[in-house]
Amino acid sequence: MTSSTTGDRRWGTTRRSGMTILGKVAVPKPINLPSQRLENQGLDPNVEIVPKGTLSWGSKSSLNAWGTSSLSPRTESGPGSPSHLSNRPSSGGSVTRPSTADSNKAHDSSSSVAWDSNSRPSSASGVFPSNQPSVALQRPHSADTRPGSSQLSRFAEPVSETSATWGQHVAPEKLGVAPSKNDGFSLTSGDFPSLGAEKDTSEKSTRPQDAGPHARPPSSSGRSVEGQGVDCTEEANDRIGDANSWRRENQPYSEDAPRHCREEGQLDSRGSQSYPNANFPPRYDAWRGPPVNNHQGGGWYGGNHPYGAPMGPGGFHMDPFPFYPTQVPPAPGHGAGPRGNHANNERMFRPPMLDSYVHPRMQTRPGFYVGPAPHEGYYGPPMGYGSPSNRDLPFAGRPTGPHAYNNHSGQGGYDTPGSSVSLERNESSHSQETQRPYKVLLKHQDGRFGEDNAKREEFLGNRLPNAEKIAQQMQTSRNERREIRNDASGEVQPVKAELAAPGDPSLIQKIEGLNAKTRTNDGWQNSSSVVNRDEQESQPRTLNSGNSANKVSARNHRTGHASDSKNSSHYNQGDSATNKNAEPAAMGGTSIFRRPTQQTQGRADPQTKRIVNSEGNDAWQKTTVMSGSSHTTLATNTESFREVNVDDSLDTESIRRPGSGISADPKDNQRSTMRELARQRAQQRQKEEEERARDQRAKALAKLEELNRRSQIYEEGSVKNMEAASNASPADMPTDPGSHSSNATNSVEPTGGSGKNTTQNTRTSTEYANNVGPSQQDNLPRDGGASKQKRLGYKQKQNIIFEKKPTGSSVATAEVFDVVPSPEVVNEGVSSNNSDMPATSTVSAESTFPKRKNNRNGKKKHKAEETATMNTTRVAVGKETKSGDESIETARARAAEIELGSVSVPSLDIKVSGDSSEQISSFTNEESQNRAKNNWKSQHVRRTQRNSLVNKPAEKFSGNNAVIWAPVHPQQKADVSTGGGSQTTVPEFGTSSKSQHQGQTSSKSKRVEIERYVPKPIVKEMAEQIVSKNLVTSAPDMSENVNQKENRGGEGTGILQPSGSTAGKSGSPSKSRHGNGRQGKHGREHASWHQRGSGAPTKALEDGQFVTSNQPIRGTVNYHSSKQTEQIAAKDQTTCNKDGWNDGWYMTPETHYSAAEEMESSAVGKDQGMSMHGRQHASRSNKDGGSNYGDPKKGNKRDFNKAHTQHSGHGFSQPDLPAASKEGRVPGDHVWHTANRTGKYGGRESTRDKPYGSQEKNVVGYEHQGFTTEQKTTSADTQAQLQNRSTNKEVQVEQNPNSMFQKNTGQGRRFGRGQESQGGWGLPAQENMHHHHQRPPSNRDRQKQNLHYEYKPVGSHTYDGERSREQSKESSQTEGPRYREKGQGQQRQGGYQQQRGTSGRNGGHGFTGDRN
């Protein structure tokens, strides 16, 4: 614009007229004319170029383009553009680039660039693509600069299109006009004058800012202003079109040229302006891409291609000063230059050799690089890459190297005595010391202390004035420590001697003297404070050495032992930890306690940590052990001591250790006095804490006793334990662990006592420590990580619990539970687990605690976590096994326990069933375990996601799902076998199931742990044995088991299929092994799928706990039975139908249903939620298992026929159901029906219909409904209805699988209804539906829900089942078992049918209720 006013001297007037036209008309005619004139007149150095393209057309279009309105659309932009183009080609075209080197031309380079845009069209003819980069750069700038630039940009694209020679003409016109229209004033006053005012230095100065960086083609200096406006546009165009070619020419710089248009201002600030001389084309970092400056004349950045290898000195075009010694200060500025762009990201857009390639040594780039002298032929990365010190260092003459990129630490000093090095040393010692506990553990002797002293000395070496003093200090400290250690080691067992050790005034005095000396030598003026701290430290140490030492003695033994079992590898302390702990304790509670405190806080305090670790890594970890194991006592003591010791021990130890060898008499005396005072205080504190520890021990013993009672009392114990655990204060918790330690061993006092007792205590304490919860586990940082130890604590907890368990102290387990975070879970676990369960309870508590930890993620995570915990438990068992004999014993005991869990669990459950409370509790545990186990297996089986989903619903129904409970089911089985007792227990259980829900979680974990093991080998054995029993001993048992399994298969299939699905996975895989591979596969899928749905229905079934009663065995048996029973199913379906029906029916936890009703209601609601998950999960299953189901439909239709028959004979179909439900959801669905019906549908039904009939209906209807209903359906009416309904349902389900799947939030219901309807439920459900049509809709809905599984086989299967049932009635083998089932069912069906009629009637209500 200044150019316009200043005007081109020649065409300025014309241009002004043109400008006027442009301004008014937005017709840049004058521009083209002037620019053409200039070019034609040879004003532009690039006129050569222009003639190629721009000149000729420029001449033509000069007035024509301007004048030609038709062209003016394009010519509008064009003329101005042509001017620009002409100018740019002129500027960029020929000599401009070299002239760009001129500062003026550098300034003009913008105009030149603009001209480059013009010349670009001319260049488009191929003249100077290099100008185009600047043009392209110009464009963005002008686009940014001028409001019309966007239009210019628009036109720019056409220009790039038209950047052909004529296109240049037209496009420039277009550009010129359109901008003039849009920016008429801008183009008129600014752009066009820019074009015209190539001579205008004002334009130059104006544009050079933008163009300066671009100033490669500065030839058109006067045009720079024009270039600013139109240039950027044209540049944009050129950049779009030609810039590529231009860039190709001068790519290193051409890239920047466009950038410069965009980033012109930036680049100027970064680049050209970085260079003091505008004359020098600004250098551009390779990373930035060769700046536009790369113009022939202007490329400072003469360096190799930005990506090219760094060029040797002088290799750069602008390297006229090859290898300048870096006259410029080595570090330009941290953000200086493009290096700033490289920024600390260290992202090199270009090779590290950015400006260094251009040796920025040239002072032209003042602050930029001194130019790194190539070190060994390597140019250090541009200083800008790293922190300035690092990056600049290479240039500063410091070693260049990748460190410059990544090593910010290099700042502090490669050589820099700056604290970084010393700090690193200190930190290194610190970190080493921090790590040293492990090393020290290995050494845990004077040598270690020597190292620690050496480190301290080394550390202090920086601090201490004299190495001699340091050496003395080291010597003194070592000797002192050795003495202390020797004393301590001598007193390890008699920890109380340890008190004497800390009480030993000579040692204390020595230490104090050394510390005082150290402080004095260190010049520490705060000797008094130090002394006070030392005194305090001594006191805490003394106290701690007394109390903590005692506890450490007991707990360290405990911990040592626990550490042996759990942590021997972990700590490397193991027994040595006990020794160490005992030693440090004996050594002087001072250092021990101090270390615990320091550990607690030393961890927080690196220096203290270093010092503490240096001095007493053993003690430190011992302290950690103490902290973990003794933390109960130490929790309070350590906290108080921590307060004292943290400061005291930190400062004192820091002081003492550093200055332990140094002597300062006055301060020494003061310090000695202070230390004596501190010692006295510490002794007092020790005494207090000892008393406190005694009190806590007494409390702990009381609690242990109480816990023992509670563990024996199960539920009562659980409640009490929950209350106690919940009520237990952290101190109480520690006390509990302490008490448990002492109680468990009853020899906590073995502080100076026997190692065995101490070991037992240690174990107990360790258990407690582990179980005490995160706080103690936090204190257990032995691992070096509180969180790790927390988690490890869980694992360790499990391991320890197992240890205890092998030790046979259920009480210890109970104790652990008490200490375990979740009183409910723990208590339930404890209460539910007497002997076998304690480990399970521990696992449950442990699982629960991880759950709590993971509660943040919710149900899914909890279950997955339960599963993980269960897995961890297993792992823990393995770890225990690894850890030692005790661990092995634990593993063995656990294995036996697991066997009991599956095989013995029935007896255990039966045993428990003798005590309905216990049974409930155990049942709950088993439930929980089954559920968790199912989760675990599912998770374990790769169903984790689904299982997680299932686990969520299951988590919702944690109680209910737990109620599905294979182990309990074995109890129930036994109970069922027992008869009403089981039934009564089941009702109790059902009644208690809610309360059990709480405990079930822990129980679930426990039982999961048990079942976890049970399902695989034991479940096999159980399956075989139980199947054999069921087959051989009694078809009723088998039927019962099968019914239970089937119920459980509904649930157990749902849950067992988590568990039985897992069992179906492990069990169904066994089935697969047994030849039910499909089912196994589907079972696995179904397992997770089923778990979900199963979890809900299972939970519902949990409500309908008859399933529970059947289910425990079924959980156990279901694996086998689902495997073998599935095989046997056909055989034993009749038997299963009898017993299974009786069981399934017999299991009639009508009472359970009452409890189950409530549970059911919640379970149903949960189930629905679960169904939603189940839906999704089922949806997945349909996706996964849907096709699988498709296949299973066939196989599972078979199986379903089998399983359906079995399902009718519910028991074997249920075993199949894990697979069949998985594969052919019908049995599974049927089971689910039963589970859902029973649990959910039937549960409510039964809950409503609590009447046995309802339960039976649910149970029998579930397990037998296919069967029993078939039996009843034997009535053509019912059967026809059922078939029709099944068909209809099947059709409906098929029609509505997704709708129902999506529709029925309660997939459990869907499972229940759909599965019921479709699954063997169909007939009974239809019969029930027949009796109660409300229920049929529910069944339909559930069928739909089932269909959500796409279990056409389910619906079809149900239909098939019905037909199969009919056929079974007609046919006897596959259908024979069905028939048998039916027959048996029918046998029962008389009563069952009656009851079922009642149940159907009631069930109708129940179904209505369930639906409601």
Curated annotation (Swiss-Prot):
Pfam families: BAT2_N. Residues 1-276, 384-437, 472-798, 827-888, 909-1144, 1156-1412 are annotated as: Disordered. Keywords: Chromatin regulator, Coiled coil, Phosphoprotein. Residues 109-119, 1384-1397 have a biased composition (Low complexity). Residues 850-862, 1071-1084 have a biased composition (Basic residues). Residues 197-207, 236-267, 478-488, 665-713, 877-888, 1006-1023, 1191-1202, 1222-1232, 1242-1251, 1338-1351, 1359-1369 have a biased composition (Basic and acidic residues). Residues 1400-1412 have a biased composition (Gly residues). InterPro entries: BAT2_N (IPR009738), MOS1-like (IPR038808). Disruption phenotype: No visible phenotype. Residues 667-717 form a coiled coil. Residues 56-103, 120-135, 517-531, 539-553, 565-581, 610-639, 738-749, 756-779, 829-847, 914-938, 983-1003, 1056-1070, 1106-1137, 1266-1286, 1293-1307 have a biased composition (Polar residues). One of its GO terms (biological process) is chromatin organization. The modification Phosphoserine is found at S72, S883. Involved in the regulation of the chromatin structure and DNA methylation at the SNC1 locus. Regulates the expression of SNC1 at chromatin level. Interacts with TCP14 and TCP15. This is Protein MODIFIER OF SNC1 1. The gene is MOS1.
